[in-house]
C-alpha cells in the first residue's frame, strides 16, 4: 500500500482534531464564544440603557429649553410692559412739566403786562400832573391865583373844624 502526501495530511488532521477533542478544546472554544456572546449581549443591553437614558435626558433638556423659552418670553413681555409704563409716565411727566413751564411763562407775561400797564399809567399820571401843574401855574398867576389860594385855605379851615 502506497501512501501519498494527501493521506499523511488527512491522517495528521484527524490526529490533531482527536487531540483537540481529547483535551476538550471544543468545550473551551464554546465557553469562550459563549462568554464573548454574553459580553456582547451585556454591551448591547448597556447600550440600550444608555440610549434610553440619553433619550430621557434629551426629553428633560427639551422640556427645560421650552420652560426657559417660555420664561424668557414672559420676561420680555414684562420688560416691554414696564418700558411702556415708564415711557407713558415719562410722557405724562414731560406734559406736566411743559404745562407748568407754560403756566409760569404766561404768569410772567401777565406780570410783565401788568407792570408795563402800571408804568404806563404812572407815566401818564405824571404827564397829566405836570400838564395840570403847568396849566394851573399859568392860570394861577395874578389875582386869580390869590383867589384860589384863599379858597383852599378856607376849605382846609372848614374841614379842620
Swiss-Prot record:
GO terms for cellular component: plasma membrane; proton-transporting ATP synthase complex. Keywords: ATP synthesis, Cell inner membrane, Cell membrane, CF(0), Hydrogen ion transport, Ion transport, Membrane, Transmembrane, Transmembrane helix, Transport. GO terms for molecular function: proton-transporting ATP synthase activity, rotational mechanism; proton-transporting ATPase activity, rotational mechanism. InterPro entries: ATP_synth_b/b'su_bac/chlpt (IPR002146), ATP_synthase_B_chain (IPR050059). It is a single-pass membrane protein. The keyword Phosphoprotein does not apply. Its main location: membrane. CDD domains: ATP-synt_Fo_b. It is found in: Cell inner membrane. It comes from the Bacteria. Coiled coil: none annotated. The chain crosses the membrane at residues 6-26. Belongs to the ATPase B chain family. F-type ATPases have 2 components, F(1) - the catalytic core - and F(0) - the membrane proton channel. F(1) has five subunits: alpha(3), beta(3), gamma(1), delta(1), epsilon(1). F(0) has three main subunits: a(1), b(2) and c(10-14). The alpha and beta chains form an alternating ring which encloses part of the gamma chain. F(1) is attached to F(0) by a central stalk formed by the gamma and epsilon chains, while a peripheral stalk is formed by the delta and b chains. F(1)F(0) ATP synthase produces ATP from ADP in the presence of a proton or sodium gradient. F-type ATPases consist of two structural domains, F(1) containing the extramembraneous catalytic core and F(0) containing the membrane proton channel, linked together by a central stalk and a peripheral stalk. During catalysis, ATP synthesis in the catalytic domain of F(1) is coupled via a rotary mechanism of the central stalk subunits to proton translocation. This is ATP synthase subunit b 1. It comes from Beijerinckia indica subsp. indica (strain ATCC 9039 / DSM 1715 / NCIMB 8712). The lineage of its organism: Bacteria, Pseudomonadati, Pseudomonadota, Alphaproteobacteria, Hyphomicrobiales.
